[in-house]
From Swiss-Prot:
Species annotation: Pyrobaculum aerophilum (strain ATCC 51768 / DSM 7523 / JCM 9630 / CIP 104966 / NBRC 100827 / IM2)
Function: Involved in allosteric regulation of aspartate carbamoyltransferase.
Domain of life of the source: Archaea
NCBIfam families named in the record: ATCase_reg
Stored InterPro entries: Asp_carbamoyltransf_reg_N, Asp_carbamoylTrfase_reg, Asp_carbamoyltrfase_reg_C, Asp_carbatrfase_reg_C_sf, Asp_carbatrfase_reg_N_sf
Assembly and binders: Contains catalytic and regulatory chains.
Protein name per Swiss-Prot or TrEMBL: Aspartate carbamoyltransferase regulatory chain
Gene Ontology terms for molecular function: metal ion binding
Record carries keyword Metal-binding: yes
Amino-acid positions noted as binding Zn(2+) in the UniProt annotation, renumbered to this chain: 108, 113, 138, 141
Length: 151
């Protein structure tokens, strides 16, 4: 394979690299990126990787991910690396790790949990109880959830 760039470099924004093959669209969904926001997003799927065999890459022009967003990506892409780009240069590089607390992003899978009651304005909250593999507990009903199950 030639050493050409499949997608041009971005001036400012975020590059999410080392996403397991086939999971880039799920990463975009987790980040709430649908394509209607006006952001330039480049998506490369199933490219060769020495580390993973095949991988996906997402480039988001004009948006830097928050630390919470970086770590929530670990739900579907535990091998991902996040690069923050400014003026075409990498200024920060992160490995994703499961967050200690997740608030308001996912629903509890327990149908009787108070967070699922339509008349209860309770924000779903989950606490990390195990890092490998990530396991969370609902702050309200005590049900355990693997991070990938919360998606």
């Amino acid at each position: 394979m030639s050493e050409e760039l499949l997608v041009s470099k971005i001036e400012n924004g975020t590059v999410i690299d080392h996403i397991p093959a086939g999971r880039a669209l799920t990463v975009l969904r987790i980040l709430g990126i649908s394509g209607k926001e006006g952001l330039r997003v480049a998506l490369v799927m199933n490219v060769e990787s020495k580390k993973l065999g095949k991988k996906d890459i997402v480039k988001i022009e004009g948006r830097e991910l928050t630390p919470e967003e970086v770590n929530i990506i670990s739900a579907v892409a535990p091998t991902a690396t996040i690069n923050i780009i400014r003026n075409f240069a990498v200024v920060k590089k992160f490995k994703v790790t499961p967050p200690d607390v997740i608030r308001g992003r996912f629903k509890c899978k327990n149908p009787t949990c108070v967070t699922n009651a339509p008349r209860e304005p309770v924000e779903p909250t989950f606490y990390l109880v195990r890092r490998e593999p990530p396991l969370f507990i609902c702050a309200y009903c005590g049900r355990y959830h693997e991070l990938g199950d919360l998606l």
